[in-house]
Amino acid sequence: MTAVFPGELLLAEGIHEIARVTALLSGPLRRAPRVAQVVGPGFAGRPWAPRLTDALRPLDPTVVVHDGPTTPDSVAALARQLRAIRADVAVAIGGGTVMDAAKAAAALADGGPPDADRVRQACAAGPAAGDTPPAVRVVAVPTTAGTGAEATPFATLWDLKHRRKLSLTGPRVRPSAAVLAPELLAGLGRRALATGILDALCQGAEASWSIRSTPESIRWGTSAVTLAAEALDQVQDDAPDAAARLALQRAAHHSGRAIALAQTSSCHAISYPLTLRLGLAHGHACGVTLGRLLRYNHAVPAGDCADPRGTGHVRRVLDALAAPLGGTPARAALRVERFITACGLTPYDALDVDHRSLAAEAVTYPRCHDNPRRLDRESLGRLLGERSEMEETCG
C-alpha cells in the first residue's frame, strides 16, 4: 500500500516497498541514485536483516553505521559521510535515534563542512521560513514501535556536554517518505515494545491536550491512543501477533503526525531530565508521568486553565483519550501505570529522583507550558511528589 499525505510525505507498507519508494524519490535523476543505508550497530543481528538487505540490493547502497546517542558530534560526522559519498537518498533503518540522526544529517549535509558547533547553531536558530528541500532525501523505515520520527519535521539531539535536549526543526528535517513494515518489530522484547508504545501514547495524548492542539492534531492523537490501546494487552503478555505489530506501527505513525502539528508538552518536558539523569529509555521516561497528568489535567479548575478554549474543551479531549484506555481518565491512568509495572519497567514512584529538582528543570523547557493546566515549579513538584493511584490501591 502506498499513499501520499498533505505535506508530500509518501507512505508505504512492507519491506518490498522500500526500494520502490527510494527509486520514486530519485526519479528526476538521469543516473542511478547514490543511496546511503543508515543503520544502527545492531542491524546485522536482527532476524529480518538478510531480507531487508536483499530488498535494497538493486540500489547498491553504501552502508553507514550510526552508533550511540544522537548528538551534535554524531550528526556532524554522519553529515560528512553523506557528503563524502554524495548521497541522493538516505534510507534510515532503525529506531528514533537512527532516524533522527539521518534526518538531521541530511538537512545539514548540503551546507558548509558540518561540525558540532554548526549543528548546535542550527538547533538554536529554529525553523527557517521557505526552506528549500535538502539535497539528500530521507526514506525513514522504523524498526521500533513508538517514536513516529518518520513523520515529524524535527529531530531530537542530546547535548551531553551541556546536559540539554536539543531539537533541529524545519521542513527540511521531515523525511520525504516512510515505510512501515511490522515484520521489522520481530525479535523485540516486551520492554522494548513497551517503551515504544508508551512514547506513542504520550505523543498522541500530548498533541491532543496541548494548548497548541488543532482539530487535526486531536484526530491524529486520539487515533494513535486508540490504536496503541488495542495492542496493550498483547504487548504486556509478550505475545503480539502480526495485527498487533501493525497497530503499534500505525499508532506510532499517527502520533508522529499529531506532534508534527502540535508538538509534545508536559510528559516530554519531564522526560528529558529523567533521561539525562537516570539514563531511562525515552518512552519509559515519558510514560512514567502520563497517568499523573491524565488525572491532573482532567481535574483542571477554571482559574488554572491555560487553554483559551476553556475547561470544557480540555475535559472533552481528556475523555476522548481515556475512552479506549479504560473509560475514564482515572481508569486510563491506572491502566497505564499497571502496564508499566507489568512490563518490568520502573514506575515513577520507585525512581531515585528528587521531585522538586526534577520539576525545576522540567519547567525550563517551553513545551512544559503547553500543558492545558498551568504548571510551574511548585505545582509540578507537588504533582510529582504525590503517590500514584496504583500505589494507593495496592498499598
From Swiss-Prot:
Q: What happens when the gene is disrupted?
A: Cells retain the ability to produce phosphinothricin tripeptide when grown in liquid culture but, the amount of PTT produced is lower.
> Which of this chain's residues are annotated to bind Fe cation?
199, 268, 282
SUPFAM superfamilies in the record: Dehydroquinate synthase-like
Pathway noted in the entry: Secondary metabolite biosynthesis; bialaphos biosynthesis
Q: Which family does it belong to?
A: Belongs to the iron-containing alcohol dehydrogenase family.
Q: Pfam families, from UniProt?
A: ADH_Fe_C, Fe-ADH
Question: EC number(s) for this protein?
Answer: 1.1.1.309
Gene Ontology terms: biological process: antibiotic biosynthetic process
Which cofactors must be present for this protein to function? Fe cation
Q: Which GO terms describe its molecular function?
A: alcohol dehydrogenase (NAD+) activity; metal ion binding
- What does the record give as the function of this protein? Catalyzes the reduction of phosphonoacetaldehyde to 2-hydroxyethylphosphonate, a step in the biosynthesis of phosphinothricin tripeptide. Phosphinothricin tripeptide (PTT), also known as bialaphos (BA), is a natural-product antibiotic and potent herbicide. Can use both NAD and NADP but the preferred substrate is NAD.
Keyword list, A-Z: Antibiotic biosynthesis, Iron, Metal-binding, NAD, Oxidoreductase
Gene3D superfamilies, alphabetized: 3.40.50.1970, Dehydroquinate synthase-like - alpha domain (1.20.1090.10)
**Regions crossing the membrane:** none
The organism's place on the tree of life at top rank:
Bacteria
Name the chain's protein.
Answer: Phosphonoacetaldehyde reductase
The record's annotation in PANTHER family points to: ALCOHOL DEHYDROGENASE (PTHR11496), DEHYDROGENASE, PUTATIVE-RELATED (PTHR11496:SF103)
Q: Which reaction does it catalyse?
A: 2-hydroxyethylphosphonate + NAD(+) = phosphonoacetaldehyde + NADH + H(+)
